[in-house]
């Protein structure tokens, strides 16, 4: 996101979109966890859409430097069904993807702008969008929502998708050690930050594989 400082309007649009996307993801995931039996999450204040409760500091750093961040992870309830596990892991990310597609559709219907077959996260890396202020806001926010939503579904701690991987995995010693190293010792965070800072092309390639087809579907591009 810092690369957009040369264009203050685009930077502010990206910043606002990222704050809203991360807050929405964390809030939705928290509400789903509470309804799945987590009685402690209400005590953390995460059942309110408060950015201070939902934006992960490392995720904010990833967003500032690499353009894509993540929200504070939600702990899994001790007693949970597979349905609850799947809902907690996927609902927030899928909600962001849905919002992103609706924003792209609104942009397409209002201005007949499409992605033109281009890689969608190129917009995120460039930090700019053409057209009027409203069109730029729709384009940048849609890409932020789509990218953040897809990133959250990847099975790497602290991302929500990892809850599904480790929640359904056998409780063998190997899996438990992997979970401990990636989550408790923050190697998962380190891997994400390294990709954001040193090899952003790899992270964007992963996101593009999912985001660009969705954008083309929404806009007919």
Model-derived segments and spans:
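Hydrophobic transmembrane alpha-helices and their immediate loop junctions
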Residues: 1-221
